[in-house]
Amino acid sequence: MQLTTTPGIDGKRITRYCGVVAGEAVLGANIFKDLFAGIRDLVGGRSGTYEKELQRARDIALEELQQRAHDLGANAVVGIDIDYEVLGKENGMLMVSASGTAVIVE
């Protein structure tokens, strides 16, 4: 299945719009990971821990989006938008949502 942030796919023609699809992932932050990330930020390094969690959440959201598109009979999703939110008490949760339009392309 093709996934793209653009409204179409070069060289392909959209023959049917199947509907809007979305996928979400909400992950809790571990206090030890947060502490380590804070120390890394203080010394100017990148937080690999947070980057891995963001990647994992994004992958889950896109997998859900793809499955929902497949369930509608689509073979592509166009116009994908990915949003990130920090939620919960003391910002202890990370939510990634992905949405787009499921289509059939030829």
Curated annotation (Swiss-Prot):
InterPro entries per record: UPF0145_dom_sf, UPF0145_YbjQ-like
Pfam families, per database record: YbjQ_1
Taxonomy, superkingdom: Bacteria
Family affiliation: Belongs to the UPF0145 family.
PANTHER family in UniProt: UPF0145 PROTEIN YBJQ (PTHR34068:SF1)
Name of the protein this chain belongs to: UPF0145 protein Nmul_A0734
Organism from which the protein derives: Nitrosospira multiformis (strain ATCC 25196 / NCIMB 11849 / C 71)
